[in-house]
């Protein structure tokens, strides 16, 4: 079953909508440059009200490992998603008590060996592949070319579990799951009416599309 993460949560009602619709994880963005920035107090309040078995994920771009540890503790985050290239092996290994998802954005000069080296050095087994953009670390709405995405997932299945992000929405997510077979999918702008404001119908449609293609693929097996 494909895991589903709804990212860029800023409101309690959006978190509850996503959780009740079947999302496996919710992302809370702490990057000061993000239009989906959420305060630690707001994130803490939303996370405290989540149903069991919905994993809260912290999105980090410029914070130090020590800041990440403190935010995870204070807010109740279960996973730290690291977006900056500055989060190398040394910084990652200073993050304690929280699982890590490391984001890679295949751009000019990118090699899948970067993922394999990072995994070997840190023991990290969670990855997210997002579309490259020099302007933003994520949530751009840009997509990864399907052949590139397929190659990334095929060449990293033996070292961990990876999510696909980048321009996914209710209209294209089923094709992405069918063609690429990611362990999970991640969306932010694809289920919004405005940055940080989720659309309940889009969230529900997105999750339904993933579950339907999962059923079709299972039946085909």
UniProtKB/Swiss-Prot annotation:
Pfam families in UniProt: PRAI (PF00697)
Gene Ontology BP terms: L-tryptophan biosynthetic process
Amino-acid biosynthesis listed as a keyword: yes
GO terms for MF: phosphoribosylanthranilate isomerase activity
Domain of life: Bacteria
E.C. number: 5.3.1.24
Alphabetically ordered keywords of this record: Amino-acid biosynthesis, Aromatic amino acid biosynthesis, Isomerase, Tryptophan biosynthesis
Pathway of action: Amino-acid biosynthesis; L-tryptophan biosynthesis; L-tryptophan from chorismate: step 3/5
Family: Belongs to the TrpF family.
HAMAP family: PRAI
Protein name listed in UniProt: N-(5'-phosphoribosyl)anthranilate isomerase
Annotated source species: Chlorobaculum parvum (strain DSM 263 / NCIMB 8327) (Chlorobium vibrioforme subsp. thiosulfatophilum)
Gene that produces this protein: trpF
């Amino acid at each position: 079953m494909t895991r589903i993460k709804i990212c860029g949560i800023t409101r309690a009602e959006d978190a509850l909508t996503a959780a009740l619709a079947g999302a496996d994880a919710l992302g809370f963005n702490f990057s000061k440059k993000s239009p989906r920035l959420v305060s630690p107090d707001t994130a803490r309040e939303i996370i405290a009200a989540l149903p069991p078995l919905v994993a809260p994920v912290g999105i980090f771009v410029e914070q130090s490992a020590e800041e990440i540890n403190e935010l995870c503790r204070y807010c109740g985050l279960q996973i730290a998603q690291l977006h900056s290239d500055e989060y190398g092996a040394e910084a990652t290994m200073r993050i304690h008590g929280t699982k890590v998802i490391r984001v890679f954005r295949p751009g000019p000069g990118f090699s899948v060996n970067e993922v394999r080296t990072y995994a070997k050095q840190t023991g990290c087994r969670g990855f997210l592949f997002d579309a490259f953009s020099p302007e933003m670390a994520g949530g751009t709405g840009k997509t990864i070319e399907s052949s590139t995405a397929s190659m990334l997932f095929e060449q990293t299945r033996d070292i961990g579990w990876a999510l696909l992000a980048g321009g996914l929405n209710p209209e294209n997510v089923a094709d992405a799951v069918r063609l690429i077979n990611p362990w999970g999918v991640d969306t932010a702008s694809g289920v919004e009416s405005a940055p940080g404001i989720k659309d309940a119908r889009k969230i529900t449609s997105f999750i339904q599309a993933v579950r339907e293609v999962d059923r079709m693929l299972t039946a085909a097996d």
